[in-house]
Amino acid sequence: MKLFRMSSDRFETVYADISDGSKPAVRFYLMVTVSTLIASFGLILNSTAVVIGAMLVAPLMTPIFGISLALVRGETDLLVQAIRAEIGGVTAAVIMSLALGLALGDFEPTNEILSRTRPNLFDLLVAVLAGFAGAYALVDEKISPALPGVAISTAIVPPLANSGLCLALGEAAAGLGSFLLFLANFLSILVVASITFVLSGMAKRFGAREAGANLFRRFQLPVVAFVLITAFLGYSLFKISQERKMAVGIR
């Protein structure tokens, strides 16, 4: 099924870009470090502009596309490479922001920090839209992937930096909430990008029944995880709504 048109030349370009950007090379970790530090300072300074600016150099979205493309096409080598890059980048981001937070000492949690400690269903919906925008921009050569890429990176790096900063403040629950936000965004982008790639004809050609069975088998774990985290964030949104109603009632 091909809902979005994609030339063979465009496919080769996209595949090469994703594969190259999913390699856990020195330049990859360098850019992760730089983007994490900028995002961390933006969170501490309570500056949305600085946080967004950090995304211009953030490389963590490409390995997610690499995982999506590898699952769609059933390519183990690309899958392993992209997973290694993503895990390494995530680990580096949390450790770097934790180290920065410890080095700075006692700092006040800002609104930018606090807003990322209790994710809910709206955060998931934003990530879904960002994931589609980024994947579609890759597929359609008339659209520059730069702007959607920034949008996606905004959903990836700040929660990781926030998690490390919260841990530095001794707020383990807030740090876990921030990491949960990253995980929700990661799964949303992964699933939506995979669907976009399938609709673009990027999956390997098999018989219809065989192709469906292969995709179902490869996507069982991501889809189940996505459904579970969607349910959890929906419950979180319900709790936040109830708390606000109670607060209004008390007033």
Feature map (PLM): residue ranges:
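Alpha-helical transmembrane segments and their membrane-interface boundaries
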Residues: M1-G131
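Hydrophobic alpha-helical transmembrane segments in multi-pass integral membrane proteins
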Residues: S97-G101, A161-G170, V227-S236
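A cytosolic-side transmembrane-helix exit/cap motif
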Residues: L69-Q81, C166-A174, I195-K204
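Alpha-helical transmembrane signal-anchor/signal-peptide segments
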Residues: I240-R251
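Hydrophobic alpha-helical segments
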Residues: T110-V192
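Cytosolic-side transmembrane helix boundary signature
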Residues: L190-F219
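Internal/C-terminal transmembrane anchor helices
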Residues: G212-I240
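Small-residue-rich segments of transmembrane alpha-helices in multi-pass membrane proteins
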Residues: I87-S97, I152-G164, R217-V223
